[in-house]
Amino acid sequence: MHGGNKYSSFYLINTISGRPSEKNLYLFNGDIVDKGCRSIECILLLFVYKLVYPFFVYVNRGNHESFQLNVRNGFRDEIIRKYGGENQFDDHFMFEYFGEIFRWMPIAHVINHKILVVHGGISGSTNLAVEDIRNKQ
């Protein structure tokens, strides 16, 4: 899911693919927020998926799960619009909490010990293998 109405896409994924399971793994590859007017609902739904199906749902952090893009592209504004008001500390803390969660999200996953999945990719001019990246951890 990238761009567009992700909230509706969750429904379609469940309808077409079924719920996450041992034989039906889900990998969401970043840019969960800043892509429509329901970013909060999308990321919270994704967190619920991860809690309910911890071994079957994986989430990579994309470049939109960063402070700079959250400010520039509207995620912070969405939080203020939906949760701001008389007590503006609420929206400030909510934005900070999401930022903290985003910083803990992994930037990559390895599938079957040989396929590296990252949101933005790796430069084509490099000759890296998954083992090379693993050795640098």
List where the protein language model places each region.
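Feature recognizes metal-dependent phosphohydrolase scaffolds
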Residues: M1-Q137
